[in-house]
Every structure is written in structure tokens, then in C-alpha cells.
Amino acid sequence: MHEHLKEKLAILPDQPGCYLMKDKQGTVIYVGKAKVLKNRVRSYFTGSHDGKTLRLVGEIVDFEYIVTSSNLEALILELNLIKKHDPKYNIQLKDDKTYPFIKITAEKQPRLLITRNVKKDKGKYFGPYPNAQSAHETKKLLDRMYPLRKCSNMPDKVCLYYHMGQCLAPCVKEVTEEQNKEIVDEIIKFLNGGHKEVRSELETKMYEASEKLEFERAKELRDQIAHIDAIMEKQKMIMSDLVDRDVFGYAVDKGWMCVQVFFVRKGKLIERDVSMFPIYDEPEEGFLTFIGQFYENSSHFKPKEIVVPGSIDSELVERFLEVEATQPKRGKKKDLVELANKNAKIALEEKFYLIERDEERTIKAVENLGKQLGIETPYRIEAFDNSNIQGTNPVSAMIAFIDGKPAKKEYRKYKIKTVQGPDDYESMREVVRRRYTRALKEGLPLPDLIIIDGGKGHLAAASDVLENELGLYIPMAGLVKDDKHKTSHLIIGDPPEPVMLERNSQEFYLLQRVQDEVHRFAITFHRQLHGKSVIQSALDDIPGIGDKRKKVLLKHFGSLKKMKEASIEEFVEAGMPKNVAETIYTYLTDKKTL
């Protein structure tokens, strides 16, 4: 341990706060919080740890800490620091999925919709539905039962839904506000948990229709009841109070945490969410960080109640989220928490087995690759590849593999700026120069190994820039392909010597994955640029189309093919004035032009 670390550890306060662990480049690699900073921070440098924590501790050369006045303040500060620094050892929930809602529009003739976009309009929203299929099945049932209009625009004549009895045809008939209100109220009652009452009313109407010998009507009502039963069978009641609540459980094993969330809506367990991640804190602290990020994401709506295990500070959760948080001691809620805990434990055991098997393979491949090349274990590998077609739209791509796995947030794309024509060597020089000049300037992590997709010329060009211009001495290897453009072997050293790997070895498979991934990333980027240039060149001669409108059209349609199939109205919808839309349409439909 560094001497200055011992000195800082000796004067840590016994107060709550946050700590920031830093590596040799001064980059924040982990942010944590603690009720007692002195105890928590010292624990990293004493006692035994699992492999993942050992890796973290091995990179720590300095730390900072911030004292807070309370545990709540520490939790809030921790989440803000994680967002600011994005440390590589912290969990950073980036769940961008949005859940569907059922919406009753506020139009004069209202409609029933499925939407993932909740707006501050006068519409009524019901949800969210973590299970999208459940939302669609419920809407389908309501469409059959309640005849609100279905068409987005009013047609000139009645549609099929009218003939099926699922629409009152406001397009050709007068449907009063009172009629719509009656239907909307019934839908609201159903969605608010009143399906039993609705079912009972339908059953009464079915018997009345049968007694009046209205057998067709009775059959329709019977079918509606059957649809209700089918939907509700999938959403069996587990709580009688109809309160919306999220029930949390968790398990910890071998430095990993699994959190299970049960979504209970209107008394029914409708879906669950499973998250698994490495943990470097005490389990309770890790759980609090997770739950803070879970609801900070807009796709997770806070229910009326949050139920947490007994080991968690429910008062802190309640104050932070401003939602009722409970720790049940008995009853159905406690049973649900225990069920969530049990599921978390089982999921962790199953997943951990797969992770262990996968990590053993990938880490061993990385270690063996280092041995074969005569270098330190290349935990971080960065690979480069160029792509162009006869010199047009030349691009390059860089990917990163960390611990033998793709680290996609580290990928970078480059448009070649200084090279004219198809010159692969100069393109490689430019990209390596740009990448590592920026890495030095911004203090970005440097790789343990650089792989250049190419032969001796590519390797020489990249090495010259790295060593003679930037003064960096990072192991660099060329990835040579065979005549079928498949991975053959590596070359390394000065002069470059071939390193032959066993074709059935894990390290060879790792190189294949690196080659395939960097090639895929580069060629995809090139095709995107090439497609854009084709569209833009096709639009160059159209009067009234400048760069701004080209970008609008490209963003809206995505391809020249879709533009050629579009109508004048669709060009207007894309933001073009009517006269410009007509000009574009005429130009693109002229066979002599394209």
C-alpha cells in the first residue's frame, strides 16, 4: 500500500459520507457511501476479498471523501457522483425501456390507445404495464366490449368495426357527449379493478337477453364474459386491497448482487424485473444505491407503496423516494418479500454458474494471449480497422475488449479527414494519432494491447505514430488474415514476427471475436455514411433542397428507396412546403432522373 494512503486512512472521520476511489491516472473508478467513512474505506485495504474486489483495490492509488450530515444526504450525493464520473466499477442502471400505458384520449370522440409516451394532456392514462402483452390483451378486450371510435382520422363512411358492433360510427352518426361519457366511465371502472362488477353486470344482461329469446345478443355477452375470464386468469389476485406496490427482494453471493422486483398492480402480480451486478459495498448500501437509480429512471413509475426486506432502512427509502416504504413482519406482504428473496437467490446461483464458466474461458484466453505475445496480461484491448470502397467515404473504427468481452460504450467511429484517396496506411496513422492524442489529453485509460487489423505496413504506420510522435510504448500487434479474409495469425515486434496460435484455443477464438467485431463496426459505419451520401447526391439537383432539408428528409425517410415510394402528402408530413413536396415527388418519380 502507498504510504500516502496509510496516512489518509489514519485520519478518516467516523461520520457518514461518500468516497471516491482513483487509479494511477487520477480517474474516479468507484464511488461509494458509508454510515461511518472510517470503517468502510479502511475495510478495502484490510482482510480478504473476492476476486472482483481485489481487482478494484489493486487499481486504487488514491481516494477522496466528502462528509455529509446524514445517510440520506450521502445516498443523494452518491447517485449524483456516479452520474457525474460514470466509474467503471459502479453499477449504472441505463434502462431506457419504457412501459406501455392504456390511454383514453380527451378528443370529442375519444379513442382507446396503447402508448409509451405519457403527455401532460387531458387524456386518462392507466398503467404502466410492465408486461406489454398484458396491455395489448386488455385493450383488445375493452375494444370488444366498449364501442369507442377506432379510426385515427374520421373516415367518410362506416368502417368494419361498426359492422362488428365495436364502434358507434361517429363519422356518420351523431354520438352525444353523454353516450361517450357512459362508455368511458365503464372503461375507467374496469381498469381501476372493477372487472368483477363488470362481469356480474354482463352476466345479468346475458340472462335477460336469453329470457327474451335474443340469443345472438346473449351469445355476444357470453363471449365477452369468456374474454374477461381469460384475461383475469392470467392476472390472479394475490392482494385484496388493490394497492399498486413494488415488492423488492435480493440475494448476495461471491461479490454479486441480484435484485428482484415484483410489480403488483390492482392486487395482481403482473410482472417482475431482475437485475444482477457486481457489488463492492455492504449489501444494504448496494441495495439502497440500486433502488435510488431504479426510480430515478423515468421508465419506472413510483407506485403507492414500496415493500423492502427487513435488513433495509425503510425510513431512508421513504424519505428519499417520497413514497410509503414498508418492512412487513407477517402476512402476504412478508410472503412476497421472501418469495422475491428466494427468486433472487435462485437466479443468482444459476447466473453465477454461467458467469463463472464464461469468465474462466475469457480471462484464461486473455492471460494465454499475453503469454503467447510475451507481454503482461492484456485486460484492455483496443482494435482498429479501416473501411472504404474505392476511396469513397473512408472511415475507421475502434473497439475495446475488457477482460475478453466487448465494452461497447468504449467504441469509437472516425471519419478520415486528412487523407485523400484510398491510402490505408495514412488513414491508420491519422486514426491512431487522433485516438491517443485525445487519450493523453483527457486522461483516458490506455490499453494493454493495441491490435491493428492489417499487415506489416499498417503495423509500422501505427507504431511510428504511437512511439515517435506521442512517446507511448504500448504493445501493438497486427492481425493478419488468410486468403479467405479470416483470422490467420498475429505479428508483433520490430521487425514483426508471426505468432501462430492453435486454431482450437480460447485465445484464437478471442482474436476471431475481436476481428469480426471491429470489421462489423467499421463496415456498418461506412454503409451508413455511404447511404447518406447517395441520398444527398440524389437530392443535389432538386430546386429548393438545401443541406438543411436534405438532413430533414434523410432523418424522416432513412433511405432513397422509401423516398421514391412516398406520396406528396408524406413529404409534407416530413416538413416540406407543399410546392417543394410536389417538386421532390416529380423529380424522384421521373425514371430518367434516377
From Swiss-Prot:
The UvrABC repair system catalyzes the recognition and processing of DNA lesions. UvrC both incises the 5' and 3' sides of the lesion. The N-terminal half is responsible for the 3' incision and the C-terminal half is responsible for the 5' incision. This is UvrABC system protein C. GO terms for biological process: nucleotide-excision repair; SOS response. Belongs to the UvrC family. Transmembrane segments: none annotated. PANTHER family: UVRABC SYSTEM PROTEIN C (PTHR30562:SF1), UVRC/OXIDOREDUCTASE (PTHR30562). Interacts with UvrB in an incision complex. HAMAP family: UvrC. CDD domains: GIY-YIG_UvrC_Cho. SMART domains: GIYc. Residues 14-91 form the GIY-YIG domain. GO terms for molecular function: DNA binding; excinuclease ABC activity. It holds the Pfam family UvrC_RNaseH. It is found in: Cytoplasm. Residues 196-231 form the UVR domain. Keywords: Cytoplasm, DNA damage, DNA excision, DNA repair, Excision nuclease, SOS response. Its main location: cytoplasm. It comes from Bacillus thuringiensis (strain Al Hakam). The lineage of its organism: Bacteria, Bacillati, Bacillota, Bacilli, Bacillales. GO terms for cellular component: cytoplasm; excinuclease repair complex.
